[in-house]
Amino acid sequence: MVEFVNPKSLGELEENVVAINRVTKVVKGGRRLRFAALVVVGDKQGHVGFGTGKAQEVPEAIRKAIEDAKRKLITVPTVSTTIPHDVLGEWGGGKILVKPAEEGSGVAAGGAARSVMELAGIADVTAKSLGSATPINVIRATFDALTSLKDAEEVAKLRGVSLEHLAE
């Protein structure tokens, strides 16, 4: 079970609109247009969330998506500027492989996964999207990967090494 973070306990949250889709519903009288927004929010200090929103107008869809994202904030365990270990996340047809990277190498991730990593405050990471390239599937797979991460102390204990040797 994932524990969500209260957004009021955090500082300023940054938002990034990942995708806006125009959705059409065909009814007897013609077509009904709506907009669906996909947004990622984070504080760049280990907390990140994503949300979706639908509305008749784009700004309203974005506002709903931001509210949804703030309700689904998670904490991401980090070691210095990267993640503690390799992890594979899956959601639907989308898979993502996330690996820690050397300090100073930056975020090597494409599209939707990049915004999740940056807003989570992970500065050095490599991510490869496998399978579905749909932004929502990539983001959900990324969140699956990030929620299955173990914290650095737990990884060091499992491997039988000290915390200092883990970062090497």
UniProtKB/Swiss-Prot annotation:
InterPro entries in the cross-refs: Ribosomal_Su5_D2-typ_SF (IPR020568), Ribosomal_uS5 (IPR000851), Ribosomal_uS5_bac-type (IPR005712), Ribosomal_uS5_C (IPR005324), Ribosomal_uS5_N (IPR013810), Ribosomal_uS5_N_CS (IPR018192), Ribsml_uS5_D2-typ_fold_subgr (IPR014721)
Keyword annotations: Ribonucleoprotein, Ribosomal protein, RNA-binding, rRNA-binding
Entry-linked Pfam families: Ribosomal_S5 (PF00333), Ribosomal_S5_C (PF03719)
GO molecular function terms noted in the UniProt entry: rRNA binding; structural constituent of ribosome
Domain S5 DRBM: 13-76
Keyword Nucleotide-binding: no
GO cellular component: small ribosomal subunit
GO terms for biological process, alphabetical: translation
Entry keyword tRNA processing: no
Disulfide bonds: none
Described purpose of this protein according to its UniProt entry: With S4 and S12 plays an important role in translational accuracy.
Domain notes: The N-terminal domain interacts with the head of the 30S subunit; the C-terminal domain interacts with the body and contacts protein S4. The interaction surface between S4 and S5 is involved in control of translational fidelity.
HAMAP family: Ribosomal_uS5_B (MF_01307_B)
Family (UniProt): Belongs to the universal ribosomal protein uS5 family.
Binding partners and assembly: Part of the 30S ribosomal subunit. Contacts proteins S4 and S8.
NCBIfam families documented for this protein: rpsE_bact
Protein's recorded name: Small ribosomal subunit protein uS5
Native species: Leuconostoc mesenteroides subsp. mesenteroides (strain ATCC 8293 / DSM 20343 / BCRC 11652 / CCM 1803 / JCM 6124 / NCDO 523 / NBRC 100496 / NCIMB 8023 / NCTC 12954 / NRRL B-1118 / 37Y)
Gene that encodes the chain: rpsE
